[in-house]
């Protein structure tokens, strides 16, 4: 993502980041302003930002296999999910296949309605069951709540509920195609899925 940072003196500083997303642009703009106010040279600021590769589990590129790009992100709240999907949508791929694992029963119960529009820019959405993170199950609280919210708010988006995480890798292996981006999101144990799917695709292509 690239943008111009306009200073109070009328000077424009071009900034280019190797990571996508409006949220990254905003963070970079804040960092650049602070650095410039502290006396840093504009060239040094733009050079430093041009080498920023992101942090672990924040739009982290996990590889490419059989023409499928794999990206993993820690996003687990509605606003984070929407920002991450918006960033991913700017990529040059055929389909954006989002995979979301709700985090904690208490959070899912409180926020499930807010997820309805968060996935609107995806082409296909998979939702797993809730990652408990030490919490006990709650009656009526599952990943199905997220599915219901998305179907209500985004009727044109195809959403599939894969209740058991153990079924997810095989499901993705059968669905993903050349030119797709598989974006996994959540604060649970979904982070290993990109590696597992790539191993499956490697085995299938041998």
Regions of interest found by a model, annotated:
Residues 3, 7-124:
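Nucleotide phosphate-binding/pyrophosphate-handling subdomain across enzymes
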Residues 13, 106, 135, 192-193:
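Glycine/Thr-rich phosphate-binding loops of Rossmann-like dinucleotide-binding domains
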Residues 83, 110-112, 138-139, 173-174, ...:
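Short amphipathic alpha-helical segments
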Residues 98-100, 127, 161, 184:
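Structural beta-sheet core signal
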Residues 102-105, 130-133, 187-190:
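Short glycine-rich anion-binding loops that position phosphate/pyrophosphate groups of nucleotides
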Residues 116-178:
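C-terminal helical cap/extension that packs against the catalytic core
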């Amino acid at each position: 993502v690239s943008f111009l940072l306009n200073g109070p003196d009328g000077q424009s500083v071009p900034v280019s980041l190797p990571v996508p997303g409006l949220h990254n642009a905003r963070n970079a703009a804040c960092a650049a302003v602070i650095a410039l106010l502290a006396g840093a040279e504009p060239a040094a600021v733009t050079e430093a930002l041009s080498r920023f590769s992101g942090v672990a589990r924040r739009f982290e590129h996990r590889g490419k296999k059989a023409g499928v790009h794999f990206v993993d992100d820690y996003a687990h709240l509605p606003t984070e999910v929407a920002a991450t999907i918006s960033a991913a949508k700017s990529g040059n791929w055929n389909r954006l296949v989002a995979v979301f694992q709700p985090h904690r029963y208490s959070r899912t119960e409180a926020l499930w309605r807010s997820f309805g529009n968060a996935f609107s820019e995806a082409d296909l959405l998979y939702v797993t069951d809730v990652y408990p993170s030490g919490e006990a199950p709650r009656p009526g609280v599952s990943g199905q709540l997220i599915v219901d919210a998305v179907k209500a708010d985004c009727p044109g988006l195809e959403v599939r509920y894969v209740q058991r995480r153990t079924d997810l890798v095989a499901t993705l292996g059968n669905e993903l195609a050349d030119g797709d981006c598989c974006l996994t999101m959540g604060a649970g144990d979904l982070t290993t899925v990109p590696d597992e799917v790539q191993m499956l695709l490697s085995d299938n292509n041998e």
